[in-house]
Protein backbone atom coordinates (compact mmCIF):
# COMPACT_ATOMS: atom_id res chain seq x y z
CA UNK A 1 0.00 0.00 0.00
CA UNK A 2 2.73 2.37 -1.07
CA UNK A 3 0.57 4.39 -1.64
CA UNK A 4 -2.87 2.89 -1.09
CA UNK A 5 -4.91 3.15 -4.32
CA UNK A 6 -8.10 1.97 -6.02
CA UNK A 7 -6.47 -1.33 -7.05
CA UNK A 8 -5.85 -2.12 -3.38
CA UNK A 9 -9.44 -1.18 -2.58
CA UNK A 10 -10.57 -3.53 -5.36
CA UNK A 11 -8.43 -6.35 -3.97
CA UNK A 12 -9.86 -5.90 -0.46
CA UNK A 13 -13.42 -5.89 -1.80
CA UNK A 14 -12.85 -8.95 -3.99
CA UNK A 15 -11.04 -10.88 -1.25
CA UNK A 16 -13.86 -10.22 1.21
CA UNK A 17 -16.46 -11.17 -1.42
CA UNK A 18 -14.66 -14.40 -2.42
CA UNK A 19 -13.91 -15.55 1.14
CA UNK A 20 -16.72 -14.06 3.21
CA UNK A 21 -14.00 -13.30 5.77
CA UNK A 22 -14.98 -12.07 9.21
CA UNK A 23 -11.62 -10.34 9.65
CA UNK A 24 -9.34 -8.90 6.97
CA UNK A 25 -5.63 -8.84 7.83
CA UNK A 26 -2.98 -6.98 5.85
CA UNK A 27 0.69 -7.81 6.18
CA UNK A 28 2.55 -4.60 5.41
CA UNK A 29 6.18 -3.60 4.99
CA UNK A 30 7.57 -1.06 7.41
CA UNK A 31 9.55 2.03 6.41
CA UNK A 32 11.57 0.07 3.85
CA UNK A 33 10.26 -2.01 0.97
CA UNK A 34 11.62 -4.77 -1.26
CA UNK A 35 15.05 -3.94 -2.65
CA UNK A 36 15.63 -1.77 0.44
CA UNK A 37 13.87 1.26 -1.01
CA UNK A 38 12.33 3.66 1.52
CA UNK A 39 8.54 3.70 1.53
CA UNK A 40 6.93 6.56 -0.38
CA UNK A 41 4.37 6.98 2.43
CA UNK A 42 5.25 6.24 6.08
CA UNK A 43 3.99 3.00 7.61
CA UNK A 44 1.53 4.75 9.94
CA UNK A 45 -0.30 6.55 7.13
CA UNK A 46 -0.32 3.38 5.00
CA UNK A 47 -1.77 1.37 7.90
CA UNK A 48 -4.36 4.09 8.53
CA UNK A 49 -5.38 4.04 4.85
CA UNK A 50 -5.71 0.25 4.97
CA UNK A 51 -7.96 0.36 8.04
CA UNK A 52 -10.09 3.16 6.59
CA UNK A 53 -10.60 1.03 3.47
CA UNK A 54 -11.68 -2.29 4.93
CA UNK A 55 -8.69 -3.89 6.63
CA UNK A 56 -9.36 -4.86 10.25
CA UNK A 57 -5.82 -5.69 11.38
CA UNK A 58 -2.45 -4.54 10.00
CA UNK A 59 0.60 -6.62 10.90
CA UNK A 60 4.06 -5.26 10.17
CA UNK A 61 6.29 -7.52 8.10
CA UNK A 62 9.71 -7.42 9.78
CA UNK A 63 12.43 -5.53 7.92
CA UNK A 64 14.46 -8.71 7.43
CA UNK A 65 11.66 -10.10 5.22
CA UNK A 66 10.28 -6.86 3.79
CA UNK A 67 13.54 -5.93 2.08
CA UNK A 68 14.33 -9.35 0.63
CA UNK A 69 13.68 -11.09 -2.67
CA UNK A 70 10.14 -12.25 -3.42
CA UNK A 71 10.50 -15.77 -2.00
CA UNK A 72 11.72 -14.51 1.39
CA UNK A 73 9.18 -11.66 1.40
CA UNK A 74 6.38 -14.17 0.74
CA UNK A 75 7.65 -16.67 3.32
CA UNK A 76 7.82 -13.97 6.01
CA UNK A 77 4.26 -12.90 5.26
CA UNK A 78 2.94 -16.46 5.24
CA UNK A 79 4.72 -17.23 8.52
CA UNK A 80 2.85 -14.32 10.13
CA UNK A 81 -0.45 -15.44 8.60
CA UNK A 82 0.09 -18.96 9.97
CA UNK A 83 0.55 -17.46 13.44
CA UNK A 84 -2.74 -15.60 12.94
CA UNK A 85 -4.39 -18.93 11.99
CA UNK A 86 -5.90 -17.55 8.78
CA UNK A 87 -7.83 -19.57 6.23
CA UNK A 88 -6.97 -17.58 3.09
CA UNK A 89 -4.26 -15.45 1.54
CA UNK A 90 -5.22 -13.00 -1.19
CA UNK A 91 -2.73 -11.65 -3.70
CA UNK A 92 -2.70 -9.98 -7.08
CA UNK A 93 -1.61 -11.48 -10.37
CA UNK A 94 -1.15 -10.09 -13.85
CA UNK A 95 -2.00 -13.39 -15.58
CA UNK A 96 -4.93 -14.24 -13.31
CA UNK A 97 -4.51 -18.00 -13.83
CA UNK A 98 -4.15 -19.88 -10.53
CA UNK A 99 -3.66 -23.24 -12.29
CA UNK A 100 -0.65 -21.99 -14.30
CA UNK A 101 0.86 -20.25 -11.29
CA UNK A 102 0.36 -23.37 -9.14
CA UNK A 103 2.06 -25.50 -11.79
CA UNK A 104 5.04 -23.14 -11.80
CA UNK A 105 5.11 -23.18 -7.98
CA UNK A 106 5.17 -26.99 -7.99
CA UNK A 107 8.09 -27.13 -10.44
CA UNK A 108 11.41 -27.45 -8.60
CA UNK A 109 13.89 -24.62 -9.10
CA UNK A 110 16.95 -25.76 -11.02
CA UNK A 111 19.60 -24.94 -8.41
CA UNK A 112 22.38 -26.05 -10.76
CA UNK A 113 21.24 -23.49 -13.31
CA UNK A 114 21.13 -20.77 -10.63
CA UNK A 115 24.64 -21.78 -9.49
CA UNK A 116 25.90 -21.62 -13.08
CA UNK A 117 24.55 -18.09 -13.41
CA UNK A 118 26.02 -17.11 -10.03
CA UNK A 119 29.41 -18.50 -11.08
CA UNK A 120 29.54 -15.68 -13.63
CA UNK A 121 29.57 -13.18 -10.75
CA UNK A 122 25.82 -12.54 -10.60
CA UNK A 123 24.12 -12.36 -7.18
CA UNK A 124 21.45 -14.89 -6.15
CA UNK A 125 18.55 -12.40 -6.49
CA UNK A 126 19.72 -11.44 -9.98
CA UNK A 127 20.20 -15.11 -11.00
CA UNK A 128 16.72 -15.97 -9.73
CA UNK A 129 15.36 -12.93 -11.54
CA UNK A 130 16.94 -14.09 -14.80
CA UNK A 131 15.20 -17.47 -14.44
CA UNK A 132 11.83 -15.78 -13.90
CA UNK A 133 12.34 -12.90 -16.33
CA UNK A 134 9.34 -13.91 -18.45
CA UNK A 135 7.00 -13.36 -15.51
CA UNK A 136 5.44 -10.13 -14.27
CA UNK A 137 6.34 -8.93 -10.72
CA UNK A 138 3.01 -9.85 -9.10
CA UNK A 139 3.01 -13.27 -10.78
CA UNK A 140 6.49 -13.91 -9.38
CA UNK A 141 5.27 -12.98 -5.90
CA UNK A 142 2.12 -15.09 -6.42
CA UNK A 143 4.27 -18.15 -7.20
CA UNK A 144 6.29 -17.47 -4.05
CA UNK A 145 3.12 -17.24 -1.95
CA UNK A 146 1.88 -20.51 -3.45
CA UNK A 147 5.18 -22.20 -2.55
CA UNK A 148 5.06 -20.75 0.98
CA UNK A 149 1.51 -22.02 1.67
CA UNK A 150 2.12 -25.46 0.14
CA UNK A 151 2.06 -27.46 3.38
CA UNK A 152 -0.39 -25.25 5.28
CA UNK A 153 -4.16 -25.02 5.56
CA UNK A 154 -4.08 -21.58 3.92
CA UNK A 155 -5.96 -21.41 0.62
CA UNK A 156 -5.00 -18.94 -2.13
CA UNK A 157 -7.40 -16.28 -3.40
CA UNK A 158 -6.10 -14.80 -6.62
CA UNK A 159 -7.21 -11.34 -7.73
CA UNK A 160 -6.36 -10.50 -11.32
CA UNK A 161 -4.71 -7.12 -11.76
CA UNK A 162 -5.99 -4.89 -14.52
CA UNK A 163 -2.75 -2.95 -14.84
CA UNK A 164 0.87 -4.05 -14.85
CA UNK A 165 3.17 -3.32 -11.92
CA UNK A 166 5.21 -0.82 -13.95
CA UNK A 167 2.25 0.65 -15.86
CA UNK A 168 2.74 4.43 -15.84
CA UNK A 169 -0.79 5.32 -16.98
CA UNK A 170 -2.88 7.33 -14.52
CA UNK A 171 -6.37 5.83 -14.59
CA UNK A 172 -9.02 4.81 -12.04
CA UNK A 173 -7.08 1.60 -11.23
CA UNK A 174 -3.57 3.02 -11.65
CA UNK A 175 -0.55 1.13 -10.35
CA UNK A 176 1.27 2.37 -7.24
CA UNK A 177 4.27 2.88 -9.53
CA UNK A 178 2.28 5.30 -11.72
CA UNK A 179 0.96 7.17 -8.68
CA UNK A 180 4.44 7.52 -7.11
CA UNK A 181 5.88 8.78 -10.40
CA UNK A 182 3.03 11.27 -10.87
CA UNK A 183 3.58 12.65 -7.35
CA UNK A 184 7.32 13.07 -7.93
CA UNK A 185 6.89 14.97 -11.20
State each model region's role.
Residues 44-47, 51, 178-182:
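Hydrophobic/aromatic-rich, well-ordered segments within soluble, folded domains that form packed cores
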Residues 61-185:
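Active-site cores that bind ATP or allylic diphosphates and position pyrophosphate for catalysis
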Residues 16-17, 51, 78-82:
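Non-catalytic positions within long, well-ordered alpha-helices that form the structural scaffold/packing
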Residues 18-22, 55, 86:
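Short, high-confidence coil segments that cap the C-terminus of an alpha-helix
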Amino acid sequence: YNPFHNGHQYQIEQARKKTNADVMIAIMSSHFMQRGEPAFIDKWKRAEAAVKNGIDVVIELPYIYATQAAHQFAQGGVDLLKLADVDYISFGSECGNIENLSEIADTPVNLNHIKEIMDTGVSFPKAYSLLTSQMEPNDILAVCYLKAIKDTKIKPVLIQRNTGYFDETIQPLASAYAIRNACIQ
